[in-house]
Amino acid sequence: MAKTTKVKGNKKEVKASKQAKEEKAKAVSSSSSESSSSSSSSSESESESESESESSSSSSSSDSESSSSSSSDSESEAETKKEESKDSSSSSSDSSSDEEEEEEKEETKKEESKESSSSDSSSSSSSDSESEKEESNDKKRKSEDAEEEEDEESSNKKQKNEETEEPATIFVGRLSWSIDDEWLKKEFEHIGGVIGARVIYERGTDRSRGYGYVDFENKSYAEKAIQEMQGKEIDGRPINCDMSTSKPAGNNDRAKKFGDTPSEPSDTLFLGNLSFNADRDAIFELFAKHGEVVSVRIPTHPETEQPKGFGYVQFSNMEDAKKALDALQGEYIDNRPVRLDFSSPRPNNDGGRGGSRGFGGRGGGRGGNRGFGGRGGARGGRGGFRPSGSGANTAPLGRSRNTASFAGSKKTFD
């Protein structure tokens, strides 16, 4: 039993040792398992790490490959991109060149448009400037024309003023015999501007000739006097008024136009363009204002005794004649401007010698043979008788007439 017990004990001890061994083994196994597990885990981890490393390496390799591939791809892509970029750059360069060309074209167009616009603007500006110049020229012309018109108007006004400022004289006719200078002046004093009045008398007598003259300061007063006094009764008789003004300027124009030059000075004046109605006494009174008048002569036709349209006024000296010529040149006498000039002095000899077979000399004493008495001569010779008939039937001087003798029979009628 004891053996059995020992055996059982041994068995138990064996079992326990086995169990311990098993437990140890289990523990070892567990530890080993743990270690194995750890190792496995480590291995696993290592494997995992390796796998991971491998994977990483593979991944890295793959990555490297991929990177290489990607790099190659990227390189290819880069190359393609480069090519594309080159192409794009070339295209961009082309496009840029095209764009530049287009820009240049646009710039040229812009420049052309600018030039055209500038040319248009310049042309428009030039046209505007030309139009402005034309307008300015037109304005200048208008201003010049206006100035000329103003000058003409001012000159006309000056001439009118000068004409109005010049003294004027009116003729007063149909006066009463009893009216004298003072009476005539008083009748016109209410008009204003009266300088003086004079009544024309017959020479050597105190008898009025029925007319006179009234002098005014200017033409306006004279015209007013004619308007107001025409037909007015003075001393029971209606008077007649008319303008009688002097215009020396007109005669000066005539002298310039026709080249009239005065002759050598003398004490006698020649009066040309004299009215046929000119009165000798009126001429005497007019010229006596400028000097001592000796005589007034108005030649007439011997047959009709009508004036010839000219006359002579003789002064006592040459200075008075010069004064009268300067003052009265172009003076209106009976509404006609008279032309004055110095007259050559008349010869003071006793007369010329009468010519034979002609008229006697001017102023000669007695006419010659077969002549008439000279002009102003005492008695002309009696004209001779010419038996030869008229001058048409007479033979030339120094030759005898050759006439055929009558050889026919004479017939008589009973």
UniProtKB/Swiss-Prot annotation:
The modification Phosphoserine is found at S93, S95, S96, S97, S116, S127, S129, S131, S143. Residues 1-172, 244-264, 336-414 are annotated as: Disordered. The keyword Nucleotide-binding does not apply. Methylated by HMT1, forming asymmetric dimethylarginines (DMA) within a domain referred to as an RGG box, made up of repeated Gly-Gly dipeptides interspersed with Arg and aromatic residues. Residues 96-105 have a biased composition (Acidic residues). Residues 366-384 are annotated as: RNA-binding RGG-box. GO terms for biological process: chromosome organization; DNA recombination; maturation of SSU-rRNA; ribosomal small subunit assembly; rRNA processing. Keywords: DNA-binding, Methylation, Nucleus, Phosphoprotein, Repeat, RNA-binding, rRNA processing, Stress response. SMART domains: RRM. Residues 168-246, 267-345 form the RRM domain. GO terms for cellular component: mitochondrion; nuclear envelope; nucleolus; nucleus; small-subunit processome. Residues 351-386 have a biased composition (Gly residues). It comes from the Eukaryota. Belongs to the RRM GAR family. Present with 77400 molecules/cell in log phase SD medium. This is Nuclear localization sequence-binding protein. The lineage of its organism: Eukaryota, Fungi, Dikarya, Ascomycota, Saccharomycotina.
